[in-house]
């Protein structure tokens, strides 16, 4: 499927095994797989309506490996929004996001206007937690981005993650409708602009 100029591109970054693919597959297809299959790069698409026209939410699930720096740079340069995923059971996976965030800043410039979510996945594995949510929240404040904990396995906060990411978009109105209900924030944005809804 050729890329359209009005595609809304979201890139998902994080170390290998943190659950990037699991989050994306849970959101797009509603499925979860127990086995770990390393990703080189996959793209998933979801049709959304945006300001009364159709556009595509294009989600790029990037590799957790450091072997493909050119692909990583390309995903950043083409991306409109970013999801930075670590596992709450691995401090190392949080540390590995720092150079990725720095690269986003370097390529994109003013990151305050770009939707970025810091995501602590695997919150269903709390007994093995290495990263406290308060610590990740503090990092998100430093990075001026939003923060959320998720569980792809339990489908906890998965749709909400993508909704919140789209709510951060200030340049146009894009949103998911969760069970047909709109948040007050969405209603307020829709009064100000057109509206975007996942079909």
Swiss-Prot record:
Alphabetically, which GO biological process terms does the record hold? signal transduction
- Please give the name of this protein: GTP-binding protein Di-Ras2
Where do we find S-geranylgeranyl cysteine lipid attachment?
196
One GO cellular component this record assigns the protein to is: plasma membrane
Q: Which UniProt keywords apply?
A: Cell membrane, GTP-binding, Hydrolase, Lipoprotein, Membrane, Methylation, Nucleotide-binding, Phosphoprotein, Prenylation, Ubl conjugation
Question: What EC numbers are recorded for this enzyme?
Answer: 3.6.5.-
- In the record, which positions carry Phosphoserine? 35, 126
State its role: Displays low GTPase activity and exists predominantly in the GTP-bound form.
Q: Which gene encodes it?
A: DIRAS2
Positions of post-translational Cysteine methyl ester modification: 196
Q: Where is this motif: Effector region?
A: 36-44
**Native species of this protein?**
Homo sapiens
Cite the GO molecular-function annotations of the record: GDP binding; GTP binding; GTPase activity
